[in-house]
Amino acid sequence: MNATVVPPYSGHWLTNTDRMGGLAYGIGVSIGILMLITTITLTSYYCTRSHISASPTTTPRTRRRQRESNGTLPPGQERFDFEDDESDTVVVEVLGLTEEVIKGFPKLPYEEARVSYSLQKESSTTSCCSICLADYKKMDMIRVLPDCNHLFHDNCVDPWLRLHPTCPVCRTSPLPSPAMTPVADVVPFSRRPMMDI
């Protein structure tokens, strides 16, 4: 009779070949996943980098010039761009208002602004500046934004308007829109003859 002799279990992981195969499999899968993540990351980096440098005709400066020639740059707003000697272009877009436009908004002492503008309607900007959250004092210089009549300290709202072309509270643009034509001028009123009954 042929009897196979099975060695007794020693309990040590290095002598057990089944456990050794499981460990090798786990290490192999971990290394494979790590290599896959690295490959995807490097490939996406190089593809993005080559895509940016492959299209020199659509630089931000070219797009800015196209927008300016189309007339999409609103009046009273500025854009600045800086170019270095290398092939990279740095564009800084400042969409705020020009200094001339900002200085054109009413600026007066708080006492006068409160009487002239704020008593018409009670709002959150009548007693304190929404930017610095400080209460207005009688002699504080206040800038009043047109259309919404919100009040702000002039030294608080002027830097805001240089960067943003809208009111900090309601986001209304203080600039007149380019297409402000009354409807009556475009479509005349139609008149129906009145019928006596």
Curated annotation (Swiss-Prot):
It holds the Pfam family zf-RING_2. A zinc finger (RING-type) spans 129-171. GO terms for molecular function: transferase activity; zinc ion binding. GO terms for biological process: protein ubiquitination. GO terms for cellular component: membrane. Its EC number is 2.3.2.27. Pathway: Protein modification; protein ubiquitination. The chain crosses the membrane at residues 20-40. It is a single-pass membrane protein. Keywords: Membrane, Metal-binding, Transferase, Transmembrane, Transmembrane helix, Ubl conjugation pathway, Zinc, Zinc-finger. Coiled coil: none annotated. It comes from the Eukaryota. Gene3D superfamilies: Zinc/RING finger domain, C3HC4 (zinc finger). Belongs to the RING-type zinc finger family. ATL subfamily. The RING-type zinc finger domain mediates binding to an E2 ubiquitin-conjugating enzyme. This is Putative RING-H2 finger protein ATL71. The gene is ATL71.
